Amino acid sequence: MTGSPAFFKAGHHQLVLGQKTYIAGILNVTPDSFSDGGQFVSLDDALRQAERLIAEGADLLDIGGESTRPGSQKVSVAEEINRIRPVIAQLVSRFSVPISVDTFKADVAEAALSAGATIVNDVTALMGDHRMAEVVARMKAGVILMHNAVLYRRGHPSATIFTNLPTLPESIAEPLRQLDLLAATRAFLALGCQRALEAGVAVEQIILDPGVGFGLLTDESIALMAELEQIQCLPGVRLPLLVGPSRKRFIGELLDRPLDDRAIGTAAAVAASIARGADFVRVHDVDPVAQTTRLCDAILRRCPEARP
């Protein structure tokens, strides 16, 4: 494709694309996240986990202050800010890796960016809060736009279990429901891209995420990963792709593995994603994924840094 960005820009960070796969290590400072809830609520525990993730090979840290797992409880803006702001401030003072904040609330994003984060990971692709695009643009942050089928699949069995996410107006949701999954994914992300670009966010500041596991049945998550290369939304432009398969339900269902035994399945999903064009992966278990990305990059990207 022509006009594709050569790098991803987020604040003062600039990551070259196409030479390696970047790993975003997940750090949830929540009591109820689906996989690691309650483990890193204290500041000391969060900092120790961040140090471990970076030592294992994380290139970025993704900080979450509100769980979006099925059945999770809503958190006020003030509480979400109180959870993440001190952690981000300490991380920025201790480490040089980019910090991402996982939120769909503009006020939370602004507080996180003011504390030193440089990326907003928005699971609603800027459609959960009408102010989010303006905040991202004004603060020159990078943004991850995630396709989220929960927002338009009212009543779908794979979507109703997510109780903590907004829904789209029917004028937007109904046309998306009429499309096949790949087309709906592209159209959803196109809406997010349009909001970003109209607000003044540069193409170089945007990452796309197909949203595997959000409002999707197992075969649908697999289908999106298989068609990852086709998930784009700007004519003539290939935007970088992030995939977040970590410990997801579709891995457990396919492999018949409980939540705490999905590291190998996650690594396999990461390898398949890289082969299909992923530039970033978001995971809990960094060490096995770092080995996976290093080998995949050596083979698929001919990356000299991946070889000893």
Question: What are these model-predicted stretches?
Answer:
Residues 48-64, 276:
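Catalytic domains of carbohydrate-active enzymes, especially glycoside hydrolases
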